[in-house]
């Protein structure tokens, strides 16, 4: 999240990419990452410590490509530069399609399009209200995770409770318990998210949930 907003301030194009969800996906993810990097040709990659070996393997330790962990990134000294205010048609970020039917394609998102999307979600769609509280387990490389539950709450100054996607996959009812406990009013998921909860829930779980706030 910090790296994404740092790119916006610095006038750089952010490219959020997926991480492997399971141990068995790492080899296929590494091959997929090579294709994505060849497509977007980044100048730098910022990733978590646990993914550094995989990223370095995918990039073949290319000396021309800066690969940083989050800790290294945060430790960099602050540069004394004049930040440029973005204009509406500047590129805000590059978002890749899911790749469910073909190899993911990068879609250019401008600042104008981001703001239009935020307004459509907050004012025309969900119609957010002061005091709403969001809950999400959607990953930030996912359009609804990034725009719906990161950028929209920032733009509308709402609180958000985040559950790691991996934690939801292992214990989906944690999502519903988080909504119940913190009185979340806004939360969405793809159909499989609801189906996963339905398969895992039992009568005891239902008795402990109060989703009337949602």
Identify the role of each PLM range.
Residues 9-78, 84, 190-191, 196:
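Structural core segment of the AMP-binding/adenylate-forming
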Residues 30, 38, 50, 59-68, ...:
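Conserved adenylate-forming
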Residues 67, 76-103, 113, 117, ...:
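Conserved pre-ATP/AMP-binding loop-to-beta segment of ANL
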Residues 1-9, 27-31, 138-155, 169, ...:
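Conserved coil-to-alpha-helix start sites within the AMP-binding
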